[in-house]
Design a protein with these regions (language model features):
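Class I S-adenosyl-L-methionine
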Residues: 12-26, 182-215
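A short SAM/SAH-binding and catalytic strip from SAM-dependent methyltransferases
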Residues: 141-154
Length: 215
């Protein structure tokens, strides 16, 4: 089970989706249960969930630990969009050690910390990148994400349209979204965009959504 989950939303005065955070560094450590044991991660000011594991990601990891996903072929590409310090990406990497996981974030401090966390936990199958650094021809078998809802509706829709289009024809995305921040309307929007979306769990105010491809 994830540990050190904060009881409130991250109150950072600077947006976690800023490309170059200027907030003074305030490192924190937290632990999560990976697929093969405990993982220890660092986070920092100016990065999403600067005090430890946030509620949404905690719910997501608990749900996905028990969810029966379709088999993924070794050598496939997987990704975490908006990786932050890397809790989701590192979990993916431990669950699918024969696949390559792209941990993607616009925030350079988040990318730096995610790289450190991957090295610290001896995970060599993670590539940390900005969105522009990911080859657009890559097709992903799986995407896991706690998407950056607070970037605004239009920007969020643009982000999801871009990345869902990079799913393989049999690919599946799993997202966690706060139900009070539009989870149900977002699910409807994705379904209408030819990405059939279903709710696989609802817990502690969050929805976990499964998104498939209809091409």
């Amino acid at each position: 089970m994830p540990k050190n989950t904060p009881s409130s939303s991250d109150p950072s005065p600077q947006h976690y989706f800023s490309e170059s955070p200027q907030a003074p560094s305030r490192r924190k450590e937290f632990a999560i249960s990976g697929h093969v044991g405990e993982l220890t991660l660092s986070t920092d000011a100016g990065v999403f969930s600067q005090y430890g594991l946030d509620k949404g990601t905690s719910v997501f990891l608990e749900v996905m630990a028990k969810h029966e996903c379709a088999p993924i072929v070794p050598g496939s590409f997987l990704c975490d969009i908006g990786c932050g310090s890397g809790a989701i990406a590192l979990t993916l990497a431990t669950r699918y050690p024969d696949c390559t996981v792209y941990a993607v974030d616009t925030n350079e401090r988040a990318r730096s910390i995610c790289k450190e966390n991957a090295v610290r936990n001896n995970l060599g199958n993670i590539i940390v990148a900005s969105p522009e650094e990911v080859d657009p021809s890559i097709r992903f078998a799986s995407m896991w994400s706690n998407p950056p809802i607070r970037i605004g509706k239009s920007a969020l829709h643009e982000l999801l349209e871009t990345w869902l289009a990079r799913l393989a024809n049999d690919g599946v995305a799993h997202l966690v979204v706060n139900k009070n921040l539009g989870a149900d309307s977002l699910a409807d929007w994705m379904s209408n965009l030819s990405y059939p979306t279903s709710r696989i769990a609802s817990r502690n105010g969050f929805r976990v959504l499964e998104v498939t491809v209809d091409r």
